[in-house]
Amino acid sequence: MNIKSELNYSNGSNDSDIYNEYGGGSGDETYNKSDTVDFRSKVIPQQSNLPPINNKTDRSHFRESMVASKKTIGAFVISDIAIGKGAFATVFKGLNTLSGDFVAIKRFEKSKISNEQHSSVSTEFDILQRLNHENIVRILGREENENYIYIFLEYMENGSLSTILNNFGTFPESLICNYVENVLKGLVYLHQEGVIHRDIKAANILINKAGEAKLSDFGTAGEIIKESDKRYSVVGTPYWMAPEVIEISGHCQVSDIWSLGCTIIELFTSYPPYFDLNPLGAMYRICQDDRPPLPDDISSELANFLERCFCKSTEERATAKELLSHPWITKNRTNLINHQRNSSKQFTSPQIIINNHQKSLLSNSSGGDDSVTDSDLSISNQSSRSSSFLLDDGGGGGGSKNHTVILTKQQPTPDQIEFNKMQMELQLLRLRVGELETDLKKEQDLKKDSDRKYREILLSSMHYIYIIDSTMNTITNSGGQSIKPQISNDVNHLRSIMRDQIETEYFQTFPDDNMVPRFIQRRFTHVDQANMMIPKKALEAQKRREKEQEKLKEQEKLKEKKKEKDIKKEKDKKDKKDKQLKDSSSSTTTTNSTPSTPDHSAFHSSPITPLSPVRENSKPFLSLKGRSSSKIFNE
């Protein structure tokens, strides 16, 4: 056997010796099993850098430790990553094992919170559970064990405004306005639901990955039944407190507006008003000053907005709904829409650049091909506000010329921008209406389908019951005689109960339809009614309807009679009044025609009672002796 070895070992002999030992020297020799080959090498092999097979790396050890330390609370897995920490709770990042979404898990340690703080946790859960708004953090659940209380919340990727402020510095006015508009929408919903937040500040406003602001931390929130109601407790953070809260004159809905104004100054300057003072000094200044000092370099609209927020009187202070229509909000909203429209135009409005490299294409003087190739026409997406025509001679009259023609639209006027904006909003509303109509139609179809199936089930049950009744009423024997089958009382009672239940369900579900189903009516025509069990509920319903119709007819008749009586009474009253007027007019004419004589009969007929004699010492008259005439006159 000829084996050609290509192994290159260094063992003291050359490659040809090894090759010949395998019988490859002459090509005719065969391999002998007794021959030995020495593969010993003088070179010591080095240790390999590759890891051994099935060896566990540090990463695998890390995963094992993660699996061992994994904490599962209900359907959620809590990690060791703390994304926030407050006075009473720590917030961790978690995973929803059902949906795969990240969640925020707020953990309260029972040993470190008082009974009052425990009630605030329950209040926060109860309030968040019944709230549902796009600018309020959603609650996903609650769990509790011996040591901790867990509240599962919507995960906000960008964190709080306070964290963003610490990482990126103060915000521009336009961005602050966007966040404030979202917060105002959430406050409008809260106040409509009878809830006041009572702790509005940057740390309690969270931002998701879409840049939308949402209110969070409802541990100090309170509920009010009416807008005029107030909560008489000092709750909140001192620098953001409204004066009526500090003075314990009542915490109301517009107290959140004062805190919102302080939050705007916080986002603009990194600190709330009076932050250079201690909390007690700040609270004193809040109550004594007319309003907090406003930052410099703010627009007049924002200054007016803050003045509306910082009105000392709660009756004069603006509400969240009123501030949503403030010029500072509406102007920024318009600017944002225009900016988005212009940025979209930058990619959708192309400039057509026509490059003509041949002079004949412009002058059309030569007889060559006048077609424009793909290289002569190019489209650029660079936006420009002016149109230009550039001519570049390549030298001399016969040189080539490059012409660049930029075609752009004229800048739209403000009226056109407003019109386009309204058109866009109208189109969005139409799309939304169409979606709602489609959803409504689907729901109506589903309801009709479910009603149809339900009715079919009821009708089938009734059909089955009446088939049993008809077969058990009469049975024809071999001699052609009709006999009644003998059934036990229990079976008969059970059959009656089932029939009554099904009939009641059917006639209560479909009261306006035909009372007797068609298959029963058909059986009435084929079977003798004397031997047929008529549906009791159907007859009762029909009788009840007939009585109601008769009652309605009687009521209508009574109404007509009453109306006729009223008309007749009014007519009699009017006739009587006219008659009295005629009589009075005739009597006045007779009295004017005849002279009247004085009648003294009443005077003569009335008896005259004589005056009783007055005694000297009797009351009320006293003796006049020794008294002057002036005194007597004065008396």
UniProtKB/Swiss-Prot annotation:
Residues 417-456, 536-585 form a coiled coil. GO terms for molecular function: ATP binding; metal ion binding; protein serine kinase activity; protein serine/threonine kinase activity. Its EC number is 2.7.11.1. One of its GO terms (cellular component) is cytoplasm. Residues 360-405, 540-635 are annotated as: Disordered. ATP binds at residues 83-91, 106. SMART domains: S_TKc. Keywords: ATP-binding, Coiled coil, Kinase, Magnesium, Metal-binding, Nucleotide-binding, Serine/threonine-protein kinase, Transferase. The active site is at 199 (proton acceptor). It comes from the Eukaryota. Residues 360-392, 583-598 have a biased composition (Low complexity). It holds the Pfam family Pkinase. Transmembrane segments: none annotated. It is an enzyme of class 2 (transferase). Disulfide bonds: none annotated. Its cofactor is Mg(2+). Belongs to the protein kinase superfamily. STE Ser/Thr protein kinase family. This is Probable serine/threonine-protein kinase DDB_G0270146.
